[in-house]
């Protein structure tokens, strides 16, 4: 019944974000935007990224090595592309190095996480909870162990799916094409 859901939500221990450490994995445009949001909640923001950012706009973010990133983050938000060097980054070894009770968010690519290792970390309480908008297999297999855990919220790769975001994507594509035709392409990755 709805009242049971409400009672369960009220009784679930809440976590204060203020003063906690938010770790951003991948400090591109989306990771940077998320970092600003975390800062707005009064969080200390650290990041691990392949390339050190030197622009002064990144000064509020502590750029750290991967070991420090895992050890100090209370919340980890993943924003990196899936490449041969990032695939399976979040495996059993990485989860073991994290703080107890860390919260994990992945809106990037499912292949960055070893899902069985995440399921084990969630069952043990090492990871307090996970919010996943992406999975290794999409659509995911029915027997995926993450589906059977109460401390996991999974959406079907729909974070971008609002009507407004689709219209904005069309506008961005048009502007990017115009810039390309003018010899000034945007979002170039070398």
Residue ranges and their predicted role:
Residues 51-145:
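Rossmann-like adenosine-cofactor binding region
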Residues 1-6:
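Short, small-residue-biased leader/transition segments that mark boundaries at the very start
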Residues 31-32:
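N-terminal Rossmann-fold NAD(P) dinucleotide-binding loop
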Residues 35, 39, 122:
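Gly/Ala-rich phosphate-binding loop of Rossmann-like dinucleotide-binding domains
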Residues 46:
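Conserved beta-strand positions in the Rossmann-like core of class I SAM-dependent methyltransferases
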Residues 11-13, 136-190:
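C-terminal helix-to-coil terminal segments
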Residues 27-28:
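Glycine-rich Rossmann-fold phosphate-binding loop(s) that bind the pyrophosphate
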